[in-house]
Regions:
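Positively charged n-region of N-terminal signal peptides that target proteins for export
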Residues: 1-4
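C-terminal motif of bacterial Sec signal peptides marking the signal peptidase cleavage site
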Residues: 12-15
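Ser/Thr-rich, low-complexity intrinsically disordered terminal regions
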Residues: 17-119
Length: 119
C-alpha cells in the first residue's frame, strides 16, 4: 500500500516539473478579439479565480508586459498574455504546465472555456 501511494504521488507531481521557460516555449492556443485589454482582464480574472480544483481558491496575479499584461492564475503553472493590438486584444494561453498524468487536459479545458466566454 505504501509503495502504491508513493507511486501515485510521483505520477501526480510529474506535471509540476516544468519551469517558466519550458511552459512559454509553445503556446497552447492563441485568440484575437475586438474587445479591449481591460475588458478581457475584467472578464477573465473572476472566471479564473472562481475555480478551486479541490484546493484553496485561486488568486490570479497580473504582471505587466511591454504591450499588455500576463495573467498568472495557478502558482505559475500557466500564463495568459493579453496583448494590445490595432484590432483589439491578442490572447495567448500557455497551459502546458498544468498537465499531469492523472488529469492531462482538465485544467486546460476549463481555462480555454473561460477565455472563449470572454471573447
Amino acid at each position: 500500500m505504501r509503495k502504491l501511494m508513493i507511486g501515485l504521488v510521483a505520477l501526480g507531481l510529474a506535471g509540476c516539473a516544468m519551469n517558466y521557460s519550458d511552459i512559454r516555449k509553445n503556446s497552447t492556443q492563441t485568440f484575437t478579439t475586438t474587445k479591449s485589454l481591460e475588458q478581457m482582464e475584467t472578464c477573465l480574472i473572476p472566471k479564473l479565480d472562481s475555480e478551486t480544483y479541490n484546493g484553496p481558491a485561486i488568486n490570479t496575479t497580473v504582471k505587466p508586459l511591454e504591450n499588455g499584461v500576463t495573467l498568472v492564475p495557478l502558482a505559475g503553472l500557466e500564463f495568459i498574455d493579453l496583448i494590445k493590438s490595432n484590432a483589439g486584444t491578442e490572447v495567448v494561453y500557455y497551459g502546458e504546465g498544468t498537465k499531469s498524468i492523472l488529469f492531462p487536459e482538465r485544467r486546460i479545458k476549463v481555462t480555454l472555456k473561460a477565455i472563449k466566454s470572454c471573447l
